[in-house]
């Protein structure tokens, strides 16, 4: 029964839930909060951590290690959201750009970006 409950909870967990957790930890934090410690070190530190996680994700993909890729992908998403928070950017800001980009073809969007 517990496994089924756990699976149901995981199916409902979204990136928005993770962003909300990061927001809450940023607000309350404390010595025990890894998130708060990252944020306290500033955007440059958060960017370096994101880079480290990106490399680990790439390695997992190249090695075709599915389990490791999933775990590193989760770390990558977490650190990306922390970097956004540290930089004063919201997930909704990123989603708005994605919505604009998906309104036209990828090639048209890329060409428009290159002109800017």
From Swiss-Prot:
Its main location: cytoplasm. It is found in: Cytoplasm. It comes from the Bacteria. InterPro entries: HisE, PRib-ATP_PPHydrolase-like. Pathway: Amino-acid biosynthesis; L-histidine biosynthesis; L-histidine from 5-phospho-alpha-D-ribose 1-diphosphate: step 2/9. One of its GO terms (molecular function) is phosphoribosyl-ATP diphosphatase activity. Disulfide bonds: none annotated. It is an enzyme of class 3 (hydrolase). Its EC number is 3.6.1.31. GO terms for cellular component: cytoplasm. Keywords: Amino-acid biosynthesis, ATP-binding, Cytoplasm, Histidine biosynthesis, Hydrolase, Nucleotide-binding. It catalyses: 1-(5-phospho-beta-D-ribosyl)-ATP + H2O = 1-(5-phospho-beta-D-ribosyl)-5'-AMP + diphosphate + H(+). Pfam families: PRA-PH. One of its GO terms (biological process) is L-histidine biosynthetic process. Belongs to the PRA-PH family. PANTHER family: HISTIDINE BIOSYNTHESIS BIFUNCTIONAL PROTEIN, HISTIDINE BIOSYNTHESIS BIFUNCTIONAL PROTEIN HIS7. This is Phosphoribosyl-ATP pyrophosphatase. The gene is hisE.
